[in-house]
Amino acid sequence: MSPVASTCLLCEMRTVVWGWQPAVPQPWHFVRFASSARLARRKPARMALSPNVARSSDRFKDSKKKKPPPTFKNNPFGGMNQTRARLPDRPIPRSDAELKRSSSDLNNKEKDAADKKQDGSLFRALKMQIALSPIPYSRRNRIKEKIAAVTSFDQFPLLPQVREAVYANAFPTLTEISPTPIQRVAIPALLRPPISETEKNKRKKKPQEEEEEELFHFDQFLLAAETGTGKTLAYLLPIINWIKQAEMVEKDTELMDNGEKQQGVTEKSKENLFELEAPELATPEHSNVARPRAIILVPTAELVEQVGKLAKQLSHTAKFRSATISSVYTPRRITNSLFNPAGIDILISTPHLLTSIAKTNPYILSRVAHLVIDEADSLLDKSFSPLTYSIMEKTAPSLTQLILCSATIPRSLDSVMEKKFPEMKRLVTPNLHAIPRRVQLGVVDVDKDPSRGNKKLACADIIWSLGKAGEVAAFLSQKGIHTAALSRDTPDQRKDEILAEFTHVKPLPTPQEVKDAQRNKRNWFSDPVPFATGENSHLGPQRNLRDTKVLVTTDLGSRGIDTVAVRNVILFDVPHTTIDFIHRLGRTGRMGRRGRGIVLVSKKDRKDVVKEVREAMFRGQALI
């Protein structure tokens, strides 16, 4: 708007008549006529058309005749609004950035897949309470390939009498005997030549400071394998083999000493023909009296009996002396076992009892060459470790081999080994920390019907259902009905025999069989009440399972006990850690047998943990 257009009508007339020009407009003039100024402003660009809007573009001259070339873009939205398949004559080149991005994505996917395989993609709840030391699957595969060629005990460098003891005493009822994975791994590693007494005496004595630093200067091994795979035999055979070799070395040394002694006596007798030799006042004491060559430490008296029984069986053929002592024995029996004049080679005991005996008789630990700590995860925890370490220190001067044995490697045991035994060799199996796939795990929600939160009722119902098929079959058999019980607990050989009667057509019956069947039929219908029994009706049915045996135990029975006959394990409470899961479910499915575990869960328990353990068992994965 011009300044003239913003003046009033009177001033404009004066300008026309007298030629008078008004002064420069003031700011208030524009404020006063702001509404008029708004109308005179320049229109925005979005409201103005281009002067070339009516002109046609060269790019769209032939738009009706020819369609624009399609654009192929490799982006998330490149496949939208397509009217035809993108089939170019040659592959579309990709940029360097896109190639880099795709290769990095592929590497990430491969890495994620490897991590998923190693750690377990479904271990979300278990990762919150990791209790076991992990073992890479690459190492598991290497061990599996290494032991694949070992199929017999004859491939081990064992003495003939030791090998014969395995076939005759360890597995007397089996026809085909082959070593388990832990035996294939451990026996070759533990076998070593014996060290003679002369070689021990030739060792140079070290200063006291160096002796303290090298207190545990001996071979150290850790045997770790799943439950029920023969770990006891894996460390017993090398020890027995070493004892027999040491006896042979000592026997040769003794013969040489006796020959030299006899030669000296002969020369002396020639010089003094008329002197009489004084008789010995007492017979020399046996060198093995209360001085065992090997000691096996176990946490409970039940394990003392179990390991001692296996050692006693092997001694019938291998010819060595073993003894067991525990708190359940009388003092007289303990004394007779330790101070037997025939000597002792292997001693099986608990740490408490052996420590108390060593305080009064420290000489008992002066000849130990092999020390085995069975169930090491228990004996090296806070409750047992002071006693176990004291026995280690007292046997260290003569010790040549320390063997730790366990079904699991908890993180606590892993830290102890890294701190105390950094040079320990770990002998593990490919399926360590994995519950065998032949063991099935069932879950019973006690909050649902029919138990409705009553765990005792749910447990009783499960036990009754386990033996119900056999009980019904026995009842029908008593009434003259040919019946056979078939369930999951039926042995495989018996299953084949039972199913053969129902899957194969029998030949026609003989005339004698027809007569017997007709006679039984007449006797059946002649009885007015065929199913009546001699029991009083007012007493009611006797609900008992004669062929079902139940053992109710605490966590004490989940460590090391070789419960071969157990087929079912009921976990009344959900285990707190995966370690307890492995040990408790390990009471069944031992030595290749089938088994079943049943967990009772309620609303207070971690159902997600039980679910992940069950899925890991189904896949054959190791727990964490």
UniProtKB/Swiss-Prot annotation:
Keywords per UniProt: ATP-binding, Helicase, Hydrolase, Mitochondrion, Nucleotide-binding, RNA-binding, Transit peptide
Enzyme class label: hydrolase
Domain Helicase C-terminal as annotated: residue spans: 438-624
Residues that hold ATP according to the record: 225-232
GO cellular component, one term: mitochondrion
Region (Disordered): 41-120
Location(s) in or outside the cell: Mitochondrion
Any one Pfam family match given in the protein's UniProt record, by short name: DEAD
Gene Ontology molecular function: ATP binding; ATP hydrolysis activity; RNA binding; RNA helicase activity
Motif (Q motif): 151-184
Domain of life: Eukaryota
EC number assigned by the record: 3.6.4.13
Main location, first listed in the record: mitochondrion
Transit peptide: 1-43
Compositionally skewed regions (Basic and acidic residues) per UniProt: 86-119
InterPro entries in the cross-refs: DEAD/DEAH_box_helicase_dom, Helicase_ATP-bd, Helicase_C-like, P-loop_NTPase
Sequence motif DEAD box, residues: 374-377
Catalytic activity field: ATP + H2O = ADP + phosphate + H(+)
Function noted in UniProt: ATP-binding RNA helicase involved in mitochondrial RNA metabolism. Required for maintenance of mitochondrial DNA.
Family: Belongs to the DEAD box helicase family. MRH4 subfamily.
Free-text domain note: The Q motif is unique to and characteristic of the DEAD box family of RNA helicases and controls ATP binding and hydrolysis.
Descriptive protein name: ATP-dependent RNA helicase MRH4, mitochondrial
Source organism of the structure: Ajellomyces capsulatus (strain NAm1 / WU24)
Gene transcribed to yield this protein: MRH4
